[in-house]
Design a protein with these regions (language model features):
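Conserved NAD(P)H cofactor-binding loop of Rossmann-fold oxidoreductase domains
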Residues: 83-88
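Conserved glycine-rich cofactor-binding loop
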Residues: 13-14
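Conserved glycine-rich Rossmann-like NAD(P)H-binding loop of the short-chain dehydrogenase/reductase
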Residues: 27-43
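Residue(s) in the substrate-gating loop at a strand-loop-helix junction
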Residues: 135
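Rossmann-fold cofactor-recognition segment
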Residues: 48-63
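Substrate-binding pocket helix/loop in short-chain dehydrogenase/reductase
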Residues: 91-92, 99-104
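Active-site helix of classical SDR
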Residues: 115, 151
């Protein structure tokens, strides 16, 4: 299925990102795995069957997102999967503002930046796939994880809006 195709996965060192890497490698995709935890990426690379490139970078920095894009833009990527993210637990009034701003940088700004950069390339060649991993939290709100709920709502609404725009243009980017 994915023979000859290449996917870039952020947050690939654990959770959904790691599982997506395993699944896509089994489907024949070559992968670029991106995360902060290099050791975990190296361990994952050993178990995968296809060509794997590891990029150890913290995408909470917009500069690092731009640098990541510049590093891989000529590699003919077919699929972008934005999985990097984290949550903060506690009453909004009690949680750390610094941690919340880090959450916004990772869960929102990195997704927004990478989607914008790769989408331009995908639209230009009229093919490509972007999967922005949100959460059921994106559909609701609740106590003790207000920043996480809000960040996943942003990802959901951004992705839906882009999808509508692409559909209206009869684009082959999904």
């Amino acid at each position: 299925m994915g023979d000859g195709m290449k996917a870039l996965i952020t947050g690939a060192s654990s959770g959904i990102g790691r599982d997506m890497a395993r699944y896509l490698s089994n489907q024949g995709y070559d992968l670029i795995l991106v995360a902060r935890r290099k050791t975990r990426l190296q361990e994952l690379k050993k178990e995968l069957k296809t060509n794997i490139e590891i990029i150890n970078i913290d995408i909470s920095s917009t500069f690092n997102c731009m640098d990541l894009y510049k590093t891989v833009k000529d590699e003919d990527i077919d699929v972008l999967i934005n999985c990097a993210g984290f949550g903060i637990y506690g009453n909004f009034n009690d949680t750390s503002l610094d941690k919340e701003l880090d959450l916004i940088d990772t869960n929102i700004k990195a997704v927004h930046t990478l989607t914008k950069l790769f989408l331009k390339d995908f639209v230009k060649k009229d093919e490509g796939y972007i999967l922005n991993v949100s959460s059921s939290a994106g559909f609701m709100s609740g106590p003790l994880m207000s920043s996480y709920y809000a960040s996943k709502g942003y990802v959901l609404k951004l992705t839906e809006a882009i999808s509508y725009e692409l559909k209206k243009e009869c684009s082959n980017v999904y």
